[in-house]
């Protein structure tokens, strides 16, 4: 069977051009004193809905930390740029993101975290909301300075306060939102050399689905893969293919990780690829 290639983007956030999902600006809430007082000691077997405290950690980059016994944390509502690795240079503002996280957690006796419902990412890292020793939202600190993109690794989506703080940072051209860095790429002109985390836009051409995912085809050779549960939540509340097919011909702006996948014709028709 003849095989072809297609870009597949694991979408973590997207919007229709002109779709208004705005909310009034709000500061992200701090962790309450009662939550900090009642926080459980991290044991490596966390439960969703509980608050945990950690007394020893190592900042690995702007959105991840290492804990004793090999446990790893990933901030589940943001993404910072990549540090230098395996001969590849650091991306813009990667070091600043790591430095900001390090500075905020420095001289803290304890930090607090809450597990996201998704629990872990595909690298085995615990997905968490992170607070410093004073109960301040660590992700918000990075977003407000333009050092992180808001994403959603959970079907319930990232906190609205983070989206609003990102909007302000973007309007002020802070950090990653400088024009030369934050350009949205066009799906129609992607090449096989491009990949990784990016912001992308393109006109919708087709819709397909699997048991748990929607696949939104864009002009060129791009398919957006997004969990059905994520679209079922507010503000979109999309639960049927008929609803999504109304988007055909409209332009979508999205962000996520892009991979170049080799698919056979049957797979391409259904766009059932794994990222």
Predicted features along the sequence, with ranges:
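Bacterial N-terminal signal peptides that target proteins for export
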Residues: 1-11
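Bacterial N-terminal signal peptides
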Residues: 10-19
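Small beta-barrel nucleic-acid-binding modules, primarily SNase/OB-fold domains
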Residues: 22-275
